[in-house]
Amino acid sequence: MERRRVVITGLGAVTPLGLTVADTWQAVRQGRCGIGPITQFDPADQKVKLAAEVKGFVPENYLPKPEAKRMGRFTQFAVVAAKEAMADAAFTLAEGEEDRCGVIVSSGIGGLSITEAEHDKGAEKGWDRVSPFYIPTAICNMAAGQIAIHTGFRGMCSCPVTACTGGTNAVGDAFHYIRDGYADVMLCGGTESAVTPLAIGGFTSMKALSQATDPNRASIPFDAERSGFVLGEGAAILLLEELEHAKRRGAKIYAEFVGYGATCDAYHMTAPRADGSGGAKAMAIAIADAGIQPADVDYINAHGTSTHLNDAGETAAVKSVFGPHAYELAISSTKSMTGHMLGAAGAVEAVISAMTLHDGFIPATINYAVPDPECDLDVVPNTGREKDVHYALSNSLGFGGHNGSILLKKWEA
C-alpha cells in the first residue's frame, strides 16, 4: 500500500491560555500559567479549589444563539476550534469532495455538567422534565458530529474515548487514515469541559488532583514536590491534509505528520506500569513508523501530568527508548501552563508541537523548583528556548492503560 505524506495546514484552539492558537502560543512562549481559582461553581465544600478554566468564552460570539444553546460547552469549544482551523487553512470544501473529508474528535467525559444539571432537575421536578436535548448534547461523540454538520464533511466521523490519550489517538488515527488513502482531509483533535463538582470530587477521591492553593505550585511536572494534576478544559482541532492535495491549493504548511504509535499497558485501571514500558513501546512504534532513529528526535512534549507515578514512569520510558540521547534532547510539559485537559490534552499538545517546529521555539516546564532524581532529564525548566527543532514527539498516557505518541517533522519544502 502506498504511504502518502500528510501535513498540518490548519490549527484551532480554545484553551486556558487563550481563545485562539495565536493567543495560546503567545502565552506558551511567555511561560504563562493558565491555572486559577475555580469560578464555574462554588468549590467551598471541595478540597480542590483550583482549575485551568477557559476564560472569557462567550459562545454567542462565534455561533448563533439557538445553535449554541443546543450544544454542550465541550462541543462549543470543539466547533469554534474547528472553525478556526478551517479558516487558518483557508480550506473550502469543493463539490464532490465531501466523502474524502472526515472528522475524528475525542472527548473523555463529554457533557458532564449537563448530566449533573439534568439529574438535579429530574430528581426535583420529575423525570419527565428531563430535556429532550440532554442525550444529544451530552454524549461524547457529539463534538465530532457537530463539526461534521458545520463543515459538510461526510467521510469517517468518529470519537475515540480513551481518557487522557483520546486527543492523541484522534490525530494519530486521522494521520493514518489519510496516509493509507482513505481520506484526503481530516479535522481531528479533542475537547473537554469537565470542571464540575462531580468531576472534581471524583478525581479528588482518587487522590489524582493537586490540592495546592498556589496556582504556581499546583501543576508542577517533574518537580519533586508534585502532588497531582490540575484539571483543565478546552479544545484543539488540527486540519490534516494529504501533501499533494495541500500543494495543489497552495496551502501553508505548519509541519509534516510522520509517525504514530499506540499501545496498552494491560495492567491497572489508573496506574501506569512503573517501568513505563507501555509508553516506551508507543514512542518506539511512532519513531519506527516515521522511519527515523531515536537520536533524530530533538524535543518531546511530555504527558507530564504532575503526578508521581506518571512523571517518573514517563522519564523511565524515555530513557529506555532513547538511551544516552535521552539526556541530550529537551522534554517539557506544557500541562504546567494548561493543566490537564483530559481528552483534549493530546490535541492541544499536538498544536503546541506543530508550533514548536514552525517557530523554532521549545516551551518550558514552568513553575519548576525542586529537582527530582527520578526525573533527571532536561525538562526545560521555567524558560523556553529559541531552537531549530527537526522532529518533535508528543506523548499521552491515559487511564485504562492507553498510550499514544505522535511524531511531527519540521516542514521543509
Role assignments for model-derived ranges:
Residues 78-91, 140-143, 148-192, 230-251, ...:
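Active-site-proximal alpha-helical scaffold in enzymes
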Residues 85-97, 245-250, 283-299, 321-325:
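Phosphate/pyrophosphate-binding loops at sites that engage ATP/ADP/AMP, CoA/4′-phosphopantetheine
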Residues 5-9, 32-36, 214-290, 299, ...:
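Condensing-enzyme catalytic core mediating Claisen C-C bond formation in acyl metabolism
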